[in-house]
Regions:
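Conserved N-terminal entry element of GNAT/NAT acetyltransferase domains
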Residues: 1-19, 23-24
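Conserved GNAT-fold acetyl-CoA-binding loop/helix
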Residues: 18-46
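A short helix-loop-beta-strand connector motif used in the catalytic cores of GNAT acetyltransferases and
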Residues: 41-58
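Conserved beta-strand in the GNAT
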Residues: 57, 62-79
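A structural microfeature
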Residues: 64-66, 90, 129
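Conserved acetyl-CoA pyrophosphate-binding loop and the N-cap/start of the following alpha-helix
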Residues: 84-97
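Conserved beta-strand-loop-alpha-helix junction that forms the acyl-donor binding cleft
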Residues: 85, 106-121, 125-126, 133-135
Length: 135
């Protein structure tokens, strides 16, 4: 198993990306997070932009299991395919990012996403900022 920079947009990665967009958009705060991540870029185009800029890391074993979007020392997204959750895939990806020369110092987690908050707490991080938005 390995965590590597994504080298291209494969059909497998594109499918996982679509699953992530679907899952995130259904969660509380998901639409706001996607708007922040995309910053005017259509969500389906963000994948290619992230890969070409060296911001997308993938966890690949016998199959693509998950990915992380990390830009400017900020983990913007971690996604693990549902069939591989609770197997330390997300933790492995985040720990790999922390060993990088430009290690992240912040991360996004959606309100109510206990699994993501627990992952970050497991590496010693604590919630420091909550962004409130009007309707």
């Amino acid at each position: 198993m390995s965590v590597l920079l994504a080298e291209g947009v494969t059909p497998e990665l594109e499918e996982l990306w679509k699953r992530a967009l679907h899952d995130v958009s259904a969660k509380r705060g998901g639409a706001a997070l996607l708007a922040t991540l995309c910053d005017g870029t259509p969500p389906e185009e963000l994948l290619a932009a992230a890969v070409s800029s060296g911001a997308l890391w993938v966890f690949h074993d016998d199959a693509l299991k998950g990915f992380a979007l990390c830009r400017a020392q900020l983990i913007e997204a971690v996604y693990v395919a549902s069939e591989f959750r609770r197997q330390k895939v997300g933790t492995t990806i985040v720990r790999h990012l922390l060993n990088d020369a430009a290690a992240p110092v912040d991360a996004y987690a959606l309100p109510g996403d206990r699994a993501m908050k627990s992952l970050y707490e497991s590496i010693g991080w604590k919630a420091r900022l909550l962004t409130m938005r009007g309707a």
